[in-house]
Design a protein with these regions (language model features):
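C-terminal long alpha-helix characteristic of the crotonase
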Residues: 40, 81, 149-154, 205-252, ...
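Glycine- (often His-adjacent) and acidic-residue-rich active-site loop
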Residues: 42, 74-117, 162-164
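Conserved CoA-thioester-binding segment of acyl-CoA-metabolizing enzymes
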Residues: 2-75
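Well-ordered beta-strand positions
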Residues: 146, 186, 190-192, 198, ...
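CoA-thioester-processing core
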Residues: 114-120, 128, 134-188, 202, ...
Length: 289
């Protein structure tokens, strides 16, 4: 049973800034990382700079021995109208004919790198959706391992076809795994808005939480997850991914299996025999059926 913190407890947690960024925030407390889009005035739409910062923060989480779970969310509310958002996708103000134009003038589509980083990360990533999850932002919540949504403010909407864009990868195919082919096609082809409860009933949200308790609940889910074996959690994540990820998924899973094998006495015998220039002897090792 997952224990839940009260919202007042969450406010007093001593989050520590890992690194100061311009368009995201990146904090950590007790092994839980909190990464948030920080452009609430535009519903947390992302630019190439946002995505570069997000990717760097996720890589830091991937490599850290001190971080066990990642919470991905959006800062808010908006200073313009008080609205909340997780992420509303790519900022159309910097969209060009060949991608999204960064400050260096180069057109890029680097949000797909972030999707892959979340998908292949060796840790659980939880989307914490306080408001709008739209377009590319909707795809990001889909690719996360779990999603918690604000009962009062979360809205799920896929606007790709409205702006002549499309996510033909995880954002659509993996969504269909979650909600079924017919509902996924409805979400994309009609572009309707869905409440947190509707998203939960479809199967793309794990829990609907009162807004004031959303982040506290996310933190408690993260802490509960961290009580589990990190190796088992990692292998379970990659195993669950494997059926959809083809040879890439197989490579990720097999790589981690090889790492586990390196810790066995059998692997040590193979290494030592090579270094000592002697005949290897695997005869003493069991052959489990």
């Amino acid at each position: 049973m997952v224990l839940f913190l009260k919202s007042t407890d969450m406010a007093t947690l001593p989050w520590k800034t890992v690194k100061a960024y311009d368009e995201i925030t990146f904090k950590v407390h007790e092994g839980v990382a909190r990464i948030a889009f920080n452009r609430p005035e535009v519903r947390n739409a992302f630019t190439p700079k946002t995505v570069d910062e997000l990717w760097e923060a996720l890589v830091t989480c991937h490599e850290s021995q001190d971080i066990g779970v990642v919470l991905l969310t959006g800062e808010g509310p908006s200073p313009k109208d008080g609205g909340w958002a997780f992420c509303s996708g790519g900022d159309q103000n910097v969209r060009s004919t060949t991608g999204y134009k960064g400050e260096n003038g180069i057109n890029r589509f680097n949000i797909l790198d972030v999707q892959r980083q979340i998908r292949f990360m060796n840790k659980v990533v939880i989307a914490v959706v306080p408001g709008w999850a739209v377009g590319g932002g909707h795809s990001l919540h889909v690719v996360c391992d779990m999603t918690l949504a604000s009962k009062e403010h979360a809205v799920f909407k896929q606007t790709d076809a409205d702006v002549a864009s499309f996510d033909g990868g995880f954002g659509s195919a993996y969504l269909a795994r979650q909600v079924g082919q017919k509902r996924a096609r409805e979400i994309f082809f009609l572009g309707a808005s869905y409440s947190a409860q509707e998203a939960y009933e479809m199967g793309m949200v794990n829990a609907v939480v009162p807004h004031e308790d959303l982040e506290a609940t996310a933190f408690s889910w993260a802490k509960e997850s961290m009580t589990k074996s990190p190796t088992a959690s990692k292998m379970l994540k990659f195993g669950l991914n494997l059926i959809d990820d083809g040879l890439v998924g197989q490579q990720v899973y097999a790589g981690e299996a090889t790492r586990l094998a390196y810790g066995t006495e059998e692997a040590q015998e193979g290494r030592d025999a090579f270094l000592e220039k002697r005949t290897r002897d695997f005869s003493r090792f069991p052959k489990f059926p």
